[in-house]
Regions:
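Glycine- and acidic
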Residues: 66-72, 101-108, 147, 151
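Alpha-helical scaffolds flanking conserved acidic
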Residues: 77-81, 115
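Active-site recognition of the HExxH zinc-binding catalytic motif
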Residues: 82-95, 119
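Contiguous, non-catalytic segments that form substrate-binding/exosite surfaces or channel walls
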Residues: 1-75
Length: 217
């Protein structure tokens, strides 16, 4: 069973609250999400994000930092952003944030499995919100199914997990939306400044032409 089959009403509620909005721009064979790209470049997330040419994506609890491979190592931009969102959801559980992570929880433990569910479902929902659904739904479904198989499903477990997913994705989407709004406002200011400069140039040219006419004999 997967999460959608186990509690369809709760899954449906989360989906309804995360209606897709197109944020990707296709650039060649890759997709780009400019707000998230700026967050990475300017280090505007709650912890440092290192992009390196290597094969692993992970969040280090002890160092409170994320490491992800380069975008070019992925088949498309959607998969890369989905991987980044997975690790960013992990980072929301750090001490001083949502205090969800337990450093002593080793691979294979119930706590580890539950955190992977939070991160992967959170990633899938963030991707869905911004219109990235095609590739990630299949990957996420397989991921969620494998981890749910290692846990005893119960209504309380599913409910508390979804609550953590909602809290984590709220932090992530709120920051993305803030950066996106800042970029739009800056773009509007740039356009307004450009129009103002063009109007000034036109006015100067008109005044110059008028002066020349007055000087003619």
């Amino acid at each position: 069973t997967n999460l959608k089959d186990a509690r369809p009403e709760l899954y449906g509620k989360l989906e309804a609250e995360n209606k897709p909005e197109k944020a990707l721009v296709q650039e060649g064979d890759m997709y780009s999400f400019h707000a998230v790209d700026r967050m990475f470049k300017e280090q505007e997330w709650i912890c440092p994000i290192n992009i390196e040419h290597q094969d692993n994506a992970f969040y280090s609890i002890s160092r409170n930092q994320i490491t992800i491979p380069e975008k070019a190592q992925f088949k498309d931009g959607e998969s890369w952003y989905g991987t980044a969102f997975h690790e960013m959801v992990h980072s929301t559980g750090a001490e001083g944030q949502l205090n969800r992570l337990k450093p002593q929880s080793g691979f294979g433990s119930d706590e580890y499995a539950r955190e992977e569910l939070v991160a992967e479902l959170g990633s899938a929902l963030v991707c869905q919100k911004y219109g990235m659904t095609k590739n990630l739904k299949e990957d996420s479904a397989a991921y969620l199914k494998s981890w749910l198989g290692s846990l005893k499903e119960s209504p309380s477990f599913i409910k508390t997990t979804l609550m953590d997913v909602k809290k984590a994705t709220s932090i992530l989407t709120q920051r993305i939306d803030e950066v996106s709004l800042e970029m739009k406002e800056q773009q509007s200011e740039d356009v307004a400044a450009s129009v103002s400069e063009e109007n000034k140039d036109a006015k100067d040219m008109k005044q110059s032409a008028s002066s020349n006419d007055n000087e003619q004999t």
